[in-house]
């Protein structure tokens, strides 16, 4: 092979190697660009998954009283790993809220209550992922729990969880709405229309406002007022509060709900919107992600549908 031919061959190989490197770099940057776009794009997340799981224990014999606990909670995958870990921890804590209060992490006052009242603690929590878009996740936690003896000292409570998938921000009711006297007029009208109850009078609405703002000092001695909201699949809002017993209010002698909630249409909330980024996310939201049911979900033997306590009522 002559020098000229060998030179041409080397030149051809060099061009092939160079082209290969350029192609590899292009593919690499394209992949990186896809990942960055997927993580940071204003379009949000579309392919994430919410898998429901369950914490379950039945008479572990680790305590001076029996326990039957079935807590369903969502586990999120497919978004930024840091935000995902943070959000999953918050979802779990929200699901376990009353279990932590009465059972796992009791205060001194609750421990004293346990010593006099507990022969059993039961909790049954269901989680309903009511809305999931490329930006927002909204969950309704509904719980029955028995704190004391007999087991039909059952309280029914509810709480909402609303989060920004891009930033991890958790939205409370007062983050997105101005809760004032005019808002209570709207809320009261919606509540009475949907329940068929008589209209709330001025005194009742003023008292209710103090509950939503958590300003009723007399109430705090017996119940903790806990406002909540969540978004429905139709992008309407369920707005309400639950009165959770501090101590002896938990003695009910029958299943008792202290939940006050109603559906409010988004257009009716317009005068009360805050400047929260939630509203921009909400307006641009479209359904996204997938919710998977809890596998091998266990029914609570005392509080589940058709279970123990319902035999007494």
Question: For each of these PLM feature ranges, what is it?
Answer:
Residues 2-22, 33-313:
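Compositionally biased intrinsically disordered regions enriched in Thr/Gly
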Residues 25-29:
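Hydrophobic core
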């Amino acid at each position: 092979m002559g020098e000229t031919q060998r030179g041409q061959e080397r030149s051809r190989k060099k061009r092939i190697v160079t082209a290969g490197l350029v192609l590899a770099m292009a593919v690499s940057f394209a992949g990186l660009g896809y990942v960055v776009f997927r993580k940071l794009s204003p379009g949000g997340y579309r392919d994430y998954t919410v898998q429901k799981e369950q914490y379950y224990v039945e008479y572990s014999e680790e305590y001076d009283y029996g326990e039957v606990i079935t807590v369903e909670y969502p586990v999120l995958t497919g978004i930024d790993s840091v935000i995902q870990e943070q959000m999953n921890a918050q979802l779990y804590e929200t699901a376990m809220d009353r279990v932590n209060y009465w059972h796992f992490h009791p205060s001194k006052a609750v421990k004293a209550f346990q010593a006099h009242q507990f022969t059993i603690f039961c909790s049954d929590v269901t989680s309903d992922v009511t809305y999931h878009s490329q930006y927002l996740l909204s969950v309704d936690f509904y719980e029955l729990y028995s704190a004391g003896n007999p087991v039909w000292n059952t309280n029914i409570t509810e709480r909402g969880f609303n989060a920004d998938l891009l930033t991890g921000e958790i939205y409370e009711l007062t983050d997105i709405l101005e809760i004032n006297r005019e808002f209570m007029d709207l809320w009261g009208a919606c509540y009475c229309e949907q329940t068929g109850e008589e209209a709330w009078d001025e005194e009742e609405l003023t008292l209710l406002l103090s509950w939503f703002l958590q300003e009723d000092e007399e109430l705090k001695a017996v119940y903790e007022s806990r406002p909540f909201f969540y978004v429905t699949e139709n992008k309407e809002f369920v707005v309400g509060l639950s009165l959770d017993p501090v101590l002896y209010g938990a003695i009910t002698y029958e299943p008792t709900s202290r939940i006050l909630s109603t559906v409010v249409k988004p257009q009716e909330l317009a005068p009360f919107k805050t400047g929260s980024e939630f509203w921009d996310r909400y307006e641009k939201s479209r359904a996204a992600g997938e919710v998977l049911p809890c596998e091998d979900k266990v029914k609570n033997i005392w509080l589940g549908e058709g279970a123990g306590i319902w035999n007494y009522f």
